[in-house]
From Swiss-Prot:
Name of the top EC class for this enzyme: isomerase
Any one annotated GO CC term: cytosol
Entry keyword annotation includes Isomerase: yes
Pfam family, one: TIM
The protein, known as: Triosephosphate isomerase
Subcellular location: Cytoplasm
Gene3D superfamilies assigned to the protein according to its UniProt record, in alphabetical order: Aldolase class I
GO molecular function, one term: triose-phosphate isomerase activity
Enzyme Commission number(s): 5.3.1.1
Name of the gene: tpiA
Lineage of source species: Bacteria, Bacillati, Mycoplasmatota, Mollicutes, Mycoplasmataceae
Pathway annotation from the record: Carbohydrate biosynthesis; gluconeogenesis; Carbohydrate degradation; glycolysis; D-glyceraldehyde 3-phosphate from glycerone phosphate: step 1/1
Amino acid sequence: MRKKVIFGNWKMNGTNKSLEDFLYQVDNKVNNSKITAGLAVPYVMLQTGIKLAKNVKIAAQNVHFELKGAYTGEISVSMLKEIGVEYVIIGHSERREMFFETDLDINKKAKILLENNMIPIICCGESLETKEQGKTIEFVNNQINLIYQNISKQDAIKTIIAYEPIWAIGTGKTANSLDAEEVCKKIRENLAKIYDNLTAEKITIQYGGSVKPSNIQEYLKMPNIDGALVGGASLLANDYLGLVNYNE
């Protein structure tokens, strides 16, 4: 049985003070033992979060694929590991679109994280144009094929996949639960082709895209949706608690 994994993503929002206030309100109220609850925050807030959070896993929103070097403005795996970061989001559509990250970049990031015993949350998802062309499954599976190149099945089961249709991120539009389940099911079937059925069944697949307390239950009751990666609805303490303490 795969444990549900629900992570908020603050993106470029908040301050150290607002994170302190947020964790004071939520950390001791995260009380669902069947769920891993987390929050991805900007780099400058990571140490604050790790110091204060006991029940909420604090994640980074990105990492560079090199261990060190002349990469101004970047952060390495070793820097994150030193301060206690376990989870890192990679391949978010905003980074793909704004910073031209490719699936091969994301593959390198996944491998360096896994080599350092950290857990990548690997984002994938299609544009509205791709969806309207009826090519969602083909597109997303191609992303997965490239990202999981040369990753062993022993490492693959440590990863988390976040299926986030680009057209549903921050727009208020959502893939309905049946459509989201269909894509997540096809992702798992593709993972079974890359590895085997047993490995595919062990990999956590989240859904993201305008998830909020009022609809999270609808998604998480689906057999192939193992959690959620949530943006805007994770910024307020009450909303976050409504997500991670949802009624099954």
